[in-house]
Amino acid sequence: MRTYVVGGAVRDALLGLPVKDRDWVVVGATPDEMLARGFRPVGKDFPVFLHPQTQEEHALARTERKTGRGYAGFAFHTAPDVTLEEDLARRDLTINAIARDADGTLIDPYGGVADLHGRVFRHVSPAFAEDPVRILRVARFAARFADFSVAPETLALMRAMVDNGEVDHLVAERVWQEFARGLMEAHPARMIRVLRDCGALARLLPELDRLFGVPQPAQHHPEIDTGEHVLMVVEQAAARAHSLPVRWATLLHDLGKGETPAAILPHHYGHEARSADLARQVSERLKAPVDCRDLAVMVAREHGILAQAAVLRAETMVKVLERCDALRRPERFALMLEAAACDHLGRGGERPENWAPAAQWQAALAAVRSVEAGAIARACADKAQVPQRIHAARVAAVKALRAHPPPAEGIS
């Protein structure tokens, strides 16, 4: 029985990156032998065991055979005579098909070390095309390793996989899982670019794909292209280390611009309402978590008016705060402001160092929350008038704030 560290642990160590988890391949063993050594079985589809001391995963060397469409149609074969090279051959990219033995010697039958040095994502074998999830994985790796490029032959294979309908068999949960992981990488825009380059974005997220090439007014968007603007906004969210809900919201905030009538371009009147509807549809189709869905819908609907805090009437500001449930959910409203700030900062040309509307909205929210709704309700004889009285008091509080505004700070 021989054991080897494989995959991401070897790759990251060679790149000088921290190694969080180690996966092992075991050659020359049977499940019974693993059990006799105290390993605990955890694999459902193929033999995977946890080491009795380290709890690290040890998988018996195996080969794979395609049996159907999509990512689930595989048959696995494990036996003591399956070699390490055969196990590595089933992996997606050469940089993930490197093993290290107990002495530290690298086993690299497919040129992964050379591709690490060349900063290239290259598929190990034509079997790459058997699993459409690999398209999403390559795109996610592009978001993590920003200085890598996809080998031309690998990109061509990915395009062929899209053309033959393999990606259409991906289940929503798996698409969301890979999208979410990619969005949380350092450069999520690169994930979107790779998916677009191979044609997968048009199949998986057509609402986003159609934004590319749609013009916007140069006065507000020097970058012109709506798709490019969205990627700049997502990059702003990543640069500020925002949470997944904020990053998802920035990705979907302008979807409605893809449905703007051509006759009114480059203007996009009413795109916020269209964007909110599409953000909900996309989030539900991909089965995104509720917090991601709700924030995306609200940011899409409100990002335009949030940017206008300086010119809004007190009445309008209070209506927005009430509509966003900001009094009960101030933390979520703060996330909306963060996403709206990314929208403002994620564009071409010169940008101010901070986004002033954030401080204006937070000050207005504080003023509204200072209104004692309970006291107003107790003092009002006509209970039917209580909501209007409370609303009027909130408007008065914001008007008073406008008369003596706090120092402008904003989100930098």
From Swiss-Prot:
Its cofactor is Mg(2+); Ni(2+). CTP binds at G8, R11, R91, R137, R140. InterPro entries: CCA_bact, HD/PDEase_dom, HD_domain, NT_sf, PolA_pol_head_dom, PolyA_RNA-bd, tRNA_CCA-adding_enzyme. One of its GO terms (biological process) is RNA repair. It comes from the Bacteria. One of its GO terms (molecular function) is tRNA binding. Mg(2+) binds at D21, D23. The keyword Lipid metabolism does not apply. Keywords: ATP-binding, Hydrolase, Magnesium, Metal-binding, Multifunctional enzyme, Nickel, Nucleotide-binding, Nucleotidyltransferase, RNA repair, RNA-binding, Transferase, tRNA processing. Residues 226-327 form the HD domain. It catalyses: a tRNA precursor + 2 CTP + ATP = a tRNA with a 3' CCA end + 3 diphosphate; a tRNA with a 3' CCA end + 2 CTP + ATP = a tRNA with a 3' CCACCA end + 3 diphosphate. Magnesium is required for nucleotidyltransferase activity. Nickel for phosphatase activity. Its EC number is 2.7.7.72, 3.1.3.-, 3.1.4.-. ATP binds at G8, R11, R91, R137, R140. A single active site specifically recognizes both ATP and CTP and is responsible for their addition. Comprises two domains: an N-terminal domain containing the nucleotidyltransferase activity and a C-terminal HD domain associated with both phosphodiesterase and phosphatase activities. Belongs to the tRNA nucleotidyltransferase/poly(A) polymerase family. Bacterial CCA-adding enzyme type 1 subfamily. Monomer. Can also form homodimers and oligomers. NCBIfam families: PRK10885.1. This is Multifunctional CCA protein. It comes from Azoarcus sp. (strain BH72). The lineage of its organism: Bacteria, Pseudomonadati, Pseudomonadota, Betaproteobacteria, Rhodocyclales. The gene is cca.
